[in-house]
């Protein structure tokens, strides 16, 4: 089933083919060149290529690996069984160290599972390496951070145009291989809307391509989240309007919405209450990694802002 997803079908197999900032790519290439990948924490936003980079490095050195999604299988029993069974045996391929990629490791329980993982990293250090990916490195306990080299997936503004064009070439090649007709300008708009979330770009293009082609009609479904509309509703304390806004916009990444609200605080909120608004946003941003219902969490966040923050 995964092969039907473009993000899997066209996932790069080596670091050279990954769309990454120059300095970051150089760092990862050094690990491959030395055939020695240390315990790593790859930190950055969703869809920027952390898991792809981890797989590509391991593929290039010819090592065996196991991928575990911590948000789905990250309970302590998984560590005690699956990880232990894999990490404690020698690779049958005779390529030396094996690796465990722990995707979305910031979802692991910091009181129980993360300390247990620290113990396994030490116990099996001779024949197994660990690569942890996360969106928020602050959610990983210091004991894990100190046992790993930390690699930040950060794109500077000066690098954005070059990376965007590089990915545009990649996307056009994929669309041509899939025999999908497309409007280049529309593809570029989609790319810049979700930059640097490459996974989101491909998923949106694949989803819309089912209609036969990528054209201007796609943009109707991808209108920017109207933060100004939300800010006005918060200012007027229109709870029903705020709730409707959430329902219509929560298909976007919740963390991206919170970031957009933060970016617009200074234009809409009285300076004296901005610090309090920031604390509220930070609290609910943290909670968003654990809640079962993002709509309720977002509404609780905005209700608190509406009632406790003074608007201009």
Predicted regions and their residues:
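P-loop/Walker A NTP-binding region and its immediately flanking N-terminal helices
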Residues: 1-158, 189, 206, 281, ...
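C-terminal helical "lid" of AAA+/P-loop NTPase domains
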Residues: 188-211, 244-247, 262
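Conserved small helical "lid"/interfacial subdomain of P-loop NTPases
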Residues: 148, 155-186
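Conserved beta/loop motifs at nucleotide-recognition and modification sites
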Residues: 64, 158, 175-176, 216, ...
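Conserved C-terminal helix/linker of AAA+ ATPases
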Residues: 202-232, 277-278
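The conserved phosphate-sensing helix
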Residues: 183-184, 193-206, 239-240, 254-256, ...
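Helix-rich C-terminal "collar"/helical-bundle subdomain used as an assembly and partner-interaction module
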Residues: 230-312
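Short conserved motifs of the RecA-like P-loop NTPase core
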Residues: 168, 181-193, 222-226
């Amino acid at each position: 089933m995964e092969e039907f997803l473009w993000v899997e079908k066209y996932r790069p197999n080596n670091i050279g083919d990954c769309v990454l900032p120059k300095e970051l790519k150089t760092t990862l290439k050094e690990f491959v060149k030395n055939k020695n990948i240390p315990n790593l924490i790859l930190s950055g936003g969703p869809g920027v290529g952390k898991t792809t980079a981890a797989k590509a490095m391991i593929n290039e050195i010819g090592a065996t690996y196991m991928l575990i999604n911590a948000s789905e299988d990250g309970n302590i029993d998984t560590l005690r069984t699956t990880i232990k069974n894999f990490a404690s045996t020698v690779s049958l391929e005779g390529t030396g160290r094996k690796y465990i990629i722990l995707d979305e490791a910031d979802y692991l329980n910091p009181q129980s599972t993360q300390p247990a993982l620290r113990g396994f990293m030490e116990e099996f250090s001779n024949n197994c390496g660990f690569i942890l990916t996360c969106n928020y490195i602050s959610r990983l306990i210091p004991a894990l951070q100190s046992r790993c080299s930390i690699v930040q997936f950060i794109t500077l503004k000066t690098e954005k145009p070059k990376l965007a064009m590089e990915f545009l070439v990649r996307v056009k090649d994929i669309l041509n291989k899939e025999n999908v007709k497309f409007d280049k300008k529309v593809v570029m708009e989609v790319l810049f809307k979700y930059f640097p979330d490459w996974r989101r770009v491909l998923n949106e293009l694949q989803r819309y391509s089912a209609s036969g082609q990528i054209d201007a009609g796609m943009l109707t479904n991808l209108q920017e989240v109207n933060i100004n509309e939300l800010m006005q509703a918060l200012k007027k304390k229109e709870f029903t309007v705020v709730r409707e806004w959430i329902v219509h916009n929560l298909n976007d990444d919740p963390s991206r919405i919170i970031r957009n609200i933060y970016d617009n605080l200074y234009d809409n909120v009285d300076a004296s209450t901005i610090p309090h608004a920031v604390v509220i946003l930070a609290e609910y941003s943290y909670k968003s990694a654990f809640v079962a219902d993002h709509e309720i969490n977002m509404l609780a966040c905005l209700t608190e802002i509406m009632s406790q923050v003074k608007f201009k």
